[in-house]
Regions:
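Aromatic "clamp/platform" in nucleotide-sugar-dependent glycosyltransferases that forms part
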Residues: 235-237
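Nucleotide-activated donor-binding/catalytic signature segment of Leloir-type glycosyltransferases, i.e.
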Residues: 194, 200-223
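Conserved acidic donor-binding segment of nucleotide-sugar-dependent glycosyltransferases
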Residues: 257, 272-279, 287-293
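Short hydrophobic beta-strand element within catalytic cores of glycosyltransferases
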Residues: 245, 253-257
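Carbohydrate-associated surface elements
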Residues: 124, 146
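Conserved donor-binding/catalytic core segment of Leloir-type glycosyltransferases
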Residues: 158-174, 180-184
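Active-site donor-binding segments of glycosyltransferases and PAPS-dependent sulfotransferases
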Residues: 2-74, 211
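Membrane-proximal helix-turn-helix segments that form the acceptor-binding/catalytic region
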Residues: 98-118
Length: 329
């Protein structure tokens, strides 16, 4: 069975979707022949997107899988043979007027109606999608993101004197301003995976917080960053999934994350949950992990069990089941 995976044209430093489905393709059963179709053009402007749609139309397989971001190409594929993955709907945040209309209809409503199966990466994303497309629940299947097998347990002596807090991501939803207010005055170092904005650097200097910035790392380098830290921070205001929670679980690091969106679902009792809009709540959570050795070790133990839910073989088998069902129709 030939399954064609349709990917956006990859931009520098933006490779999460591609890495995810490369893992899936590598782990699919032998009866599935996966092919990748990367768009020749970036998803920018009407004519480039139209060319992407035409490329998709002429590249179809027995089953088609639109893997995210370029949802609109679904409109040019055979409806009964197409799977659409929607990772999150955060791109709708703050939109209004014409941009809201275009995103709603060409990225959500019409693509959702013009495919046989929609896969989403969390129950939170499923519930949000249903609000935009009432009546779509029957075609939505939740398939979690897998954790790479590069993330393996590595014991580390916890640094009680000067712990390293690893913050994954620096975009607006990552809630950096409140995190910095929360760790102000704590004897720690903050590692940031992602490029810091000028305002964030100013706050770091204003609060006299020691930090290091890491950008454009390979997967292997990211793994080493997890291994080098003592605590992982992921107190986002919204997330479609939250893979860093599971990556930290798999390595064996305690996590503080948010009590909203998909994060409690992904954490599954393996992280300390905080209110991301409350600086004091974030500070208390971090302080609890730093100070309470028994609590921290229990979170780590829970994390190892939680990570088992995101094994790549299980995830690939779930996708394979979807492909077989569509192929048989």
């Amino acid at each position: 069975m030939k399954v064609v995976f349709f990917h956006r044209k990859q931009a520098d430093g933006n490779f999460s979707i591609e890495a995810l489905f490369q893992q899936v393709r590598n782990s699919l059963p032998d009866d599935i022949d996966p092919k990748m179709c990367e768009m020749l053009f970036y998803s920018r402007g009407f004519f480039r997107r139209l060319f992407c749609c035409l490329q998709a139309f002429f590249s179809q397989g027995e089953v088609n899988h639109v893997t995210g971001d370029i949802h609109f190409v679904t409109l040019f594929l055979r409806r009964n043979k197409t799977v659409l993955t929607i990772h999150d709907l955060g791109f709708m945040e703050g939109k209004s007027g014409l941009s809201y209309f275009i995103l709603k209809w060409f990225w959500i409503v019409w693509p959702a109606k013009h495919c046989k199966v929609i896969t989403v990466i969390s129950e939170a994303t499923k519930n949000e999608l249903i609000r935009y497309v009432p009546g779509s629940a029957s075609k939505i299947k939740v398939i979690y993101n897998p954790v790479s097998d590069l993330f393996r347990p590595l014991a580390k002596q916890f640094n009680k004197t000067r712990p390293v807090i690893l913050q994954i991501g620096t975009k607006h939803n990552k809630n950096i301003d409140r995190l910095l207010q929360a760790v102000k005055g704590l004897p720690c170092v903050v590692y940031f995976l992602g490029k810091l904005e000028r305002k964030q650097v100013q706050l770091l200097n204003q609060f006299s917080i020691s930090y290091k910035e890491y950008i454009n790392l390979s997967t292997e380098e990211v793994v080493e960053l997890y291994r080098s830290c003592d605590v992982v921070s992921f107190v986002s205001t919204v997330e479609g999934f939250g893979l860093p929670i599971v990556e930290a679980n798999a390595v064996g690091r305690a996590v503080v994350t948010s009590n909203i969106s998909s994060m409690p679902e992904v954490a599954g009792g393996s992280a300390h949950l905080v209110d991301p809009f409350d600086v004091q709540s974030i500070r208390v959570g971090i302080q609890k992990i730093l100070d309470d050795d028994a609590y921290r070790e229990q979170l780590i133990k829970n994390g190892f069990e939680n990570a088992k839910r995101f094994d790549i073989k299980q995830i690939a088998d779930q996708y394979a089941g979807v492909y077989r069902k569509l192929s048989a129709q």
